[in-house]
Amino acid sequence: MSKVAIIDFGSQFTQLLARRIRDLNIYSEIFLPNVAFDLIKGVDAFILSGGPRSVPNSDGIPKIVHDILQFNEKTSIPVLGICYGLQILSNYFESDVVSNCNKEFGKTILNIIKNSKIIENIWESGDQAYVWMSHADSVYNIPRGFEVIAYSVLNNSIAMVANEQRRIYGMQFHPEVYHTPDGINLLANFLDIAGCQKDWTVTSFIDDQQDAIKKQIGNKKVIAALSGGVDSSVAAALTYKAIGDQLHCVFIDNGLLRYNEVEKVKQLFINELKIPVTIVDKSAVFLNRLKSITDPERKRKIIGETFIEIFEEEANKLEGVEFLMQGTIYPDVVESGGSGSIAKESVVIKSHHNVGGLPKTMKFKLVEPLKYLFKDEVRILGRNLGISTEILMRHPFPGPGLAVRIIGEITEEKVKMLQAADDIYINLIKKYELYDVMWQAFVVLLPVKTVGVMGDRRTYGHACVLRAVNSHDGMTAESFPFCMDEETQWKFFKCIQEASNAIINSVNGINRVAYDITSKPPATIEWE
């Protein structure tokens, strides 16, 4: 199987880059810069990512870059540098990189001045092309042995270089983001130059992952952390397919679930997937420990610690349980700044109970079969495992549940209020046939009370916020429905108007409804 090694220097786009390569049916894997070269030299190509590092302000060229380029000198194995990756390549080949010179952020136009294999059948000399830039440092002069393929129109700075003989290419822009329209084709050209075979599929992932699970678990037992969401459902189905009755599924009712969620979980696992599940009601424990807590990070940590503690109690009732299965996926890892590629390079945005919220004293070894998959890849995997579309198309639900949708202090009364409002909103979205065309929708309860008038009487109740977004993979998101056609927009506006009326008339304690139009970035999809 062909394989591409991505050296992650901390770019927030690194996981998206890996995903885009997989879209081309070529397996990609991410490594930290401190990886031993012997572990990765068997790949078909190397990509050096972008990141927050600065060549002029660094302690020199990382050892892994020396190793890769010395290997390239002997073998001509293809190397692609993106943003910081271009800058570190250029510096290696005796070019100057300068800080705070010719900064570019956002959409940029390139002047293509020379043909190259990397742009074949995409652009040619004399063309102009749109790309997405995000850099403060710039390559000042042409690296030794390279030719410039493109300059930026904005400031005539070097935007793309190539050494055709050694098959080394550099791009100051980001081909992996959707805002670079021809980016996927540029990546495809690079992989063609590398001779990569399009032999990675979700089906092959299932087979490989089953073997990996069997090897990791042996004859031990696994306790599974089920949530009823897409991720844990697919993870459980894959793990059960691999080890059968060695998997013991437990669903904890933490009192912070969607309306009627326990019954839906029973229907899903016991009736549809035929996987035995033990349901444990610990809602009082969670709500008691969250009393008076308002900080979102503390909420997540408390939920994570309580979650593991209860699982340890359940595991102690069984003999031979050494592993905990979780439905952790890539965006969880990215935003937590933990595990693998992002551990030492990226900024923590927020912890996830599946990742950053786990206690250091946790007694289990983790089984995370979906850890390197994006949400849409998880859904493809689920279809291949025979899981129904209705289950797979459920909107994402955060591990800490409604705790991160109740801003401020959590009470049982607020939970019931939010459950009712959210159920009304989601059912109306389904009524208007919009559920399957959006990525995620939910209600947030604010710690703000507002004055209203109902039945000629003054009211003083909570405000809530409706949210709906579209996304490819959870890494970025656009507010719904502004990215949709006009008919869908009007349908959604009618939907939220009806939702507002229904929530205010049906849910005691809420007297005002607002709508959140913020994209990700700058916001995250969830409020906390």
Curated annotation (Swiss-Prot):
Enzyme class: ligase
Pathway linked to the protein: Purine metabolism; GMP biosynthesis; GMP from XMP (L-Gln route): step 1/1
Molecular function GO labels: ATP binding; GMP synthase activity
Keyword Nucleotide-binding: yes
Active site: C83, H174, E176
CC per GO annotation: cytosol
Domain Glutamine amidotransferase type-1: 3-199
Positions with a binding annotation for ATP: S227, G228, G229, V230, D231, S232, S233
Catalytic activity: XMP + L-glutamine + ATP + H2O = GMP + L-glutamate + AMP + diphosphate + 2 H(+)
Matches recorded under InterPro entries: Class_I_gatase-like, GATASE, GMP_synth_C, GMP_synth_GATase, GMP_synthase, GMPS_ATP_PPase_dom, NAD/GMP_synthase, Rossmann-like_a/b/a_fold
Chain ranges of the GMPS ATP-PPase domain: 200-394
The keyword Ligase belongs to this UniProt entry's keyword annotation: yes
Alphabetized UniProt keyword annotations: ATP-binding, Glutamine amidotransferase, GMP biosynthesis, Ligase, Nucleotide-binding, Purine biosynthesis
EC numbers, comma separated: 6.3.5.2
Subunit structure: Homodimer.
PANTHER family cross-referenced by the UniProt entry: GMP SYNTHASE [GLUTAMINE-HYDROLYZING], GMP SYNTHASE-RELATED
Reported function: Catalyzes the synthesis of GMP from XMP.
HAMAP family named among the record's database cross-references: GMP_synthase (MF_00344)
Name of the protein in question: GMP synthase [glutamine-hydrolyzing]
Origin organism lineage: Bacteria, Pseudomonadati, Pseudomonadota, Alphaproteobacteria, Rickettsiales
